[in-house]
Amino acid sequence: QQTKAVQITFHSDHKLDYGQQVLYRGGYLFPQTFYYRLKLDKICRKLRDKYKFKYDINAILSDLIYARILEPASKRSSYKTASEFLEKPSYQLHDIYRALDVLGNECDFIQSEVYKNSHLLGKRNDAILYYDCTNYFFEIEQEDGDRKYGKGKEHRPNPIIQMGMFMDGDGIPLAFSLFPGNANEQTSLKPLEGKVLQDFGCTKFIYCSDAGLGSEAIKKINHA
């Protein structure tokens, strides 16, 4: 039976029914393995028990991650991408927008839990930590919240928001934080480093950065 030939017939003049899905995406099955090995489903279960919401935040978070890897786009477009997965979304678009507030509020908790669970996949090279900052522009004309006018990497005349990130010695992300676009990036280090020390348990490491984030004030913080 395994060696038996199978013949498939195609009709070149056959018309497809309008609205019938003919494309299915299966690429998400590869990152799905790591999603569950990092126990993100259990993290989502803790959030569900805390907030008592009705929608499936595990399905939402996992689909957003898969879509971000496969085809980065807006949340609305990511929902459309997820609708083409072999496993259909069990939620609606408005549930995604509701879940974003929870994911934003619990961002630090999610990061620390993922870091702890990442040790189940292998040893982390966290004796050396690299820190750097970047920023992202928004196609808006007026400042809004932390989206402020600042010096953007792409030199666009749009409000930006900045991100600082720690990576381990292997270049794997460890923790990140977002801060206003008009803030001095050097001030972003101390709060995030405090979280790494307290929530991540990284109490002894070598700090590495470029010259812009290696000021005398930062050196004093790391040698205190």
Residue spans for each PLM region:
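Short, solvent-exposed amphipathic alpha-helical segments in soluble enzyme
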Residues: 145-148, 222-223
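Active-site beta-loop-alpha junctions of metal-dependent nucleic acid enzymes
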Residues: 177-199
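Catalytic cores of nucleotide-enabled group-transfer and carboxylate-activating enzymes in metabolic
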Residues: 149, 167-169, 195-198
